[in-house]
Amino acid sequence: MIEKLSNLLHQRKVFNRITLLMGKEVTIKTAVYTNGRLLIYVDTESHRFTFALTPEDEVQIVAIDDIFSISDLKLQLKIAEIIQSHISLNNHWRDQ
């Protein structure tokens, strides 16, 4: 399941949107979390955003690390929105 999510999030379409939004190179990683949730990490040199994907494919903000301003929080919300919309448009990803 982690590999499927990783493949979905590394499609150029979503990866490019997040990179463009951040204005710098990003790294996206996935990992297992408790209660059937999958963690999604979006890292840059200056920020690390952590999200959880629920079994119902809902993206949730897990941790607010390195948030120093309202603009940082807005950025995290925008990334969550990009990931959520990409997962919603590819709702068959778990079956592949």
What are these regions (language model features)?
Residues 17, 25, 49, 91-92:
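N-terminal cationic leader/targeting segments used for protein routing and processing
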Residues 30-73:
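Acidic, low-complexity, intrinsically disordered interaction modules
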